[in-house]
């Protein structure tokens, strides 16, 4: 279980008042929004595209479905889902950060992706959608930034249709010691320097590295999803567990 429901929580390695975390996270993403896509490619050596492609394939979206791309940021998953669900379907790109939403909206419109996509500024902990509304929900690299993860998972369960699927793509825990050592050096020595060079903001990427370490590991997140009421929960490790895709169903 998450302990984020108390009056304090973590912001990276810092302990902060729970009600202040959302604003602090917002500051990070306001700062990096304009260069977010570039940094994703650089810091993952482009591998994030493979992780996201696997997520989309695992979702099993079909024409006519309603998909929620939560914490969807600059719209990578939304763009793919929009083509899959077609004119009879709908994709909702939701993010708590208006700077990220603005970048995502402009990017998708420049690609001609309009008509079956709508944009909503929303807090994952209290989603502003009806019960039993979406066929699929994805949250990619967003859950670790949420203050009360249990509340967010419960909110996602509520708005999923019976038979619907949640997919959580998130940084996790490498499975082998040698990979953990390499990953630590890269995350804390190299990544902030990249952030400084590309976005002029080393601190935000230091937070991102710390937030990954504070996020629940694979089995803990699986248990959190089961505790919320998801069934048939499982996960797939990618790149030795640097990233994991968790899947669960609402029945």
Curated annotation (Swiss-Prot):
Signal peptide from the UniProt entry: none
Catalytic activity entry: a 2-demethylmenaquinol + S-adenosyl-L-methionine = a menaquinol + S-adenosyl-L-homocysteine + H(+); a 2-methoxy-6-(all-trans-polyprenyl)benzene-1,4-diol + S-adenosyl-L-methionine = a 5-methoxy-2-methyl-3-(all-trans-polyprenyl)benzene-1,4-diol + S-adenosyl-L-homocysteine + H(+)
GO biological process: aerobic respiration; menaquinone biosynthetic process; methylation
Pfam short name (any one): Ubie_methyltran
EC number: 2.1.1.163, 2.1.1.201
Broadest EC class assigned to this enzyme: transferase
GO molecular function, one term: 2-methoxy-6-polyprenyl-1,4-benzoquinol methyltransferase activity
Metabolic or biological pathway, per its Swiss-Prot or TrEMBL entry: Quinol/quinone metabolism; menaquinone biosynthesis; menaquinol from 1,4-dihydroxy-2-naphthoate: step 2/2; Cofactor biosynthesis; ubiquinone biosynthesis
Record-linked Gene3D superfamilies: Vaccinia Virus protein VP39
InterPro entries linked: SAM-dependent_MTases_sf, UbiE/COQ5_MeTrFase, UbiE/COQ5_MeTrFase_CS
Binding site for S-adenosyl-L-methionine: 74, 95, 123-124
Entry keyword set: Menaquinone biosynthesis, Methyltransferase, S-adenosyl-L-methionine, Transferase, Ubiquinone biosynthesis
Family statement drawn from the similarity comment of this UniProt entry: Belongs to the class I-like SAM-binding methyltransferase superfamily. MenG/UbiE family.
Protein purpose: Methyltransferase required for the conversion of demethylmenaquinol (DMKH2) to menaquinol (MKH2) and the conversion of 2-polyprenyl-6-methoxy-1,4-benzoquinol (DDMQH2) to 2-polyprenyl-3-methyl-6-methoxy-1,4-benzoquinol (DMQH2).
Name of the protein in its database record: Ubiquinone/menaquinone biosynthesis C-methyltransferase UbiE
Name of encoding gene: ubiE
């Amino acid at each position: 279980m998450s302990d984020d429901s108390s009056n304090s929580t973590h912001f990276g390695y810092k302990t902060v008042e729970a009600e202040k975390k959302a604003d602090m996270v917002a500051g990070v993403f306001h700062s990096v929004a304009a260069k977010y896509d570039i940094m994703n490619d650089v810091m993952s050596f482009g591998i994030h595209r493979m992780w996201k492609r696997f997520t989309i394939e695992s979702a099993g979206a079909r024409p006519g479905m309603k998909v929620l791309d939560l914490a969807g940021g600059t719209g990578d998953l939304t763009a793919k889902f929009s083509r899959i669900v077609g004119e009879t379907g709908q994709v909702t790109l939701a993010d708590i950060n208006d700077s990220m939403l603005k970048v995502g909206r402009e990017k998708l419109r420049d690609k001609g992706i309009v008509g079956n996509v709508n944009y909503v500024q929303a807090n994952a902990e209290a989603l502003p959608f009806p019960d039993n509304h979406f066929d699929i929900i994805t949250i990619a690299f967003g859950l670790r930034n949420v203050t009360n993860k249990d509340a967010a998972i419960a909110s996602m369960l509520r708005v999923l249709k019976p038979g619907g699927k949640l997919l959580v793509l998130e940084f996790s825990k490498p499975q082998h010691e040698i990979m953990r050592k390499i990953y630590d050096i890269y995350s804390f020595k190299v990544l902030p320097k990249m952030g400084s060079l590309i976005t002029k903001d080393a601190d935000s990427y230091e937070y991102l590295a710390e937030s990954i370490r504070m996020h629940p590991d694979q089995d803990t997140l699986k248990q959190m999803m089961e505790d919320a009421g998801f069934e048939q929960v499982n996960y797939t490790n990618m790149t030795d567990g640097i990233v994991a895709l968790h899947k669960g169903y609402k029945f």
